[in-house]
UniProtKB/Swiss-Prot annotation:
Organism ancestry: Bacteria, Pseudomonadati, Pseudomonadota, Gammaproteobacteria, Enterobacterales
Origin superkingdom: Bacteria
Protein name per Swiss-Prot or TrEMBL: Uncharacterized protein YebV
Length: 78
């Protein structure tokens, strides 16, 4: 599902939310949307909690992995 994502000053509108149940939900952030955001995500580690707004709702994200094939970060929702 297309998702609007805001992390700090960064805002994209083509994130992809996957999964239904808590603990199973992930967010894909394509690097083509905002290369500066992707560089910032690369600087954080997997334990860093990242406050975000997803479609206007407060969430906390954790970096899972970078998917080289799709050039996107995969994040898990807390």
């Amino acid at each position: 599902m297309k998702t609007s994502v805001r992390i700090g000053a960064f805002e994209i509108d083509d994130g992809e939310l996957h999964g239904e149940s808590p603990g199973d939900r992930t967010l894909t952030i394509p690097c083509k949307s905002d290369p500066d955001l992707c560089m910032q995500l690369d600087a954080w580690d997997a334990e860093t909690s990242i406050p975000a707004l997803l479609n206007g709702e407060h969430s906390v994200l954790y970096r899972t992995r970078y998917d080289q094939q799709s050039d996107a970060w995969i994040m898990r929702l807390a």
